[in-house]
Amino acid sequence: MSFITHFESLEDKRSHINKKHDLLDVIFLTVVAILSGAEGWKDIKQFGDSKLDWLRKFRAFKEGVPVDDTIARIISSLEPNALLTSFISWVNEIREEIGRAHV
């Protein structure tokens, strides 16, 4: 399974006209930025801008990196328990692949 497989079932509650940035691009950006030390929406945006070529190895980012307010709005619109469940599922897959009881 890939990272995206764990998150693709999350409901995107944005209206059709407000979907300039792909939900999975924003989730991927947010998770990898936080794992790299980002501590807020501006840090996530800055990480995305500085690592866009690397990010595009995994996701399209057709519209580039969204501004920090857009990242915040998109992530905040997700159902927290569903997001947590997706994240735990992804981490558990990694844990199982490396044969560890704990990560």
Regions found by a protein language model. Name each.
Residues 1-100:
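Dynamic "connector" segments at or just before major functional cores
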